[in-house]
């Protein structure tokens, strides 16, 4: 591994690193908004409950390691510092995004399943046939459930690789893209709540209950009627049908891993399997996945555009500060009268 990748010597990449204070400010603002949403929806959270406290303790541990190693700039200490920072931020974004869907669900009304199923029919996608393929092959049920759970395996591998190579700018690009995809997904969810094809399309007894089960159909009415009461971080369920966040995440994972030859093909296989499992395990329409892919691409492009504009923003800011300083110094010089030499001197 070259020194340019191990140590932050690439000046263009360094100039695209987002100040940590900006990211913390962004996440703090997001947290305050979610807290306000929870209050509006009459939802609480008991942090003394073990299922909630374990995530809080994990975040505190990662933050503590990051703080202790804050001055390390080489060796395994730097890798550990960066990895803890990246994983901590990813965990915070994931928990915050999933939690936000609960008060967001309380603000929804109606269901978009009829329109989504109609679009699937126009696309020629038969969800029931796809589901029956899994029902008739038990090994697909096991493989599908494992593949669907890989939404949390890919980022650990990806962020670990970026921490090892010292590519801080790319790690931040991934995190900002993931945050932006979560935000867009939640906003679209407000306009397109749905219970999913298992609840809407399937008729009769359910021969195989996938990972996402019937949570949308069960939880959305409770949240709309303010009957849930509290959110449990240890029992968070996917409430968003359209667009598919698993698909958005897979697009981001694959795109970010494509530049790393050690992770490119493993993550392509892992996320390809996750995408194949999404219609059944996530109870998604095909149009959900198309929408999710578009969300992932848009988030990547937007975050990339912001990051690539940072050098220009910094240069413009530096130019303005220089001009202000020059004006101040020139003004102060003009205000001081020139020294008059004494005749005796």
What are these regions (language model features)?
Residues 1-17:
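Short, Lys/Arg-rich, polar N-terminal cytosolic tail immediately upstream
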Residues 157-164, 247-264, 294-305:
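Membrane-interfacial alpha-helical segments at the cytosolic side of multi-pass membrane proteins
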Residues 30-38, 94, 182-189, 272-280:
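Aromatic-anchored segments of alpha-helical transmembrane domains
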Residues 81-90, 156-193, 197-207:
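Interfacial segments of alpha-helical transmembrane regions
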Residues 140-154, 237-258, 286, 290:
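Membrane-interface loop-to-helix entry segments
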Residues 187, 191-259:
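Membrane-interfacial catalytic/cofactor-binding modules of polytopic membrane enzymes
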Residues 196-199, 241, 272-299:
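Interfacial helix-loop-helix junctions of multi-pass membrane proteins
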Residues 14-58, 80, 84-155, 331:
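N-terminal transmembrane-helix/juxtamembrane module of multi-pass inner/ER membrane proteins
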């Amino acid at each position: 591994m070259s020194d340019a990748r191990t140590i932050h010597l690439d000046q263009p990449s360094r100039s695209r690193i987002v100040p940590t204070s900006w990211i913390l400010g962004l996440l703090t603002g997001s947290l305050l908004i979610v807290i306000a949403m929870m209050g509006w929806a009459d939802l609480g959270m008991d942090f003394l409950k073990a299922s909630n406290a374990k995530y809080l303790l994990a975040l505190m541990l990662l933050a503590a390691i990051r703080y202790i190693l804050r001055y390390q700039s080489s060796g395994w200490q730097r890798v550990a510092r960066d990895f803890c920072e990246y994983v901590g931020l990813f965990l915070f974004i994931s928990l915050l995004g999933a939690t936000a869907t609960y008060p967001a669900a309380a603000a929804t009304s109606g269901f978009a399943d009829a329109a989504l199923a109609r679009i699937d029919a126009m696309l020629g996608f038969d969800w029931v046939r796809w589901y029956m393929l899994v029902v008739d092959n038990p090994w697909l049920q096991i493989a599908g459930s494992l593949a669907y759970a890989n939404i949390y395996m890919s980022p650990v591998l990806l962020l670990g690789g970026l921490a090892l190579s010292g590519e801080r700018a790319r790690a931040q690009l991934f995190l900002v893209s993931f945050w932006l995809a979560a935000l867009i997904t939640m906003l679209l969810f407000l306009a397109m709540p749905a219970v999913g094809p298992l609840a809407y399309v399937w008729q009769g007894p359910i021969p195989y209950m996938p990972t996402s089960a019937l949570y949308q159909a069960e939880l959305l009415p409770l949240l709309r009627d303010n009957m849930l009461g509290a959110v449990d971080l240890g029992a968070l369920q996917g409430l968003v049908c359209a667009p598919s966040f698993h698909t958005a995440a897979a697009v981001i994972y694959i795109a970010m891993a494509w530049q790393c030859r050690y992770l490119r093909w493993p993550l392509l296989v892992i996320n390809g399997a996750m995408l194949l499992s999404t219609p059944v395990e996530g109870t998604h329409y095909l149009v959900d996945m198309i929408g999710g892919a578009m969300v992932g691409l848009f988030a990547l492009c937007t975050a990339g555009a912001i990051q690539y504009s940072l050098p220009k923003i910094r240069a413009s800011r530096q130019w303005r500060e220089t001009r202000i300083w020059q004006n101040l110094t020139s003004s102060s010089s003009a205000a001081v009268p020139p020294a008059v030499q004494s005749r005796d001197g």
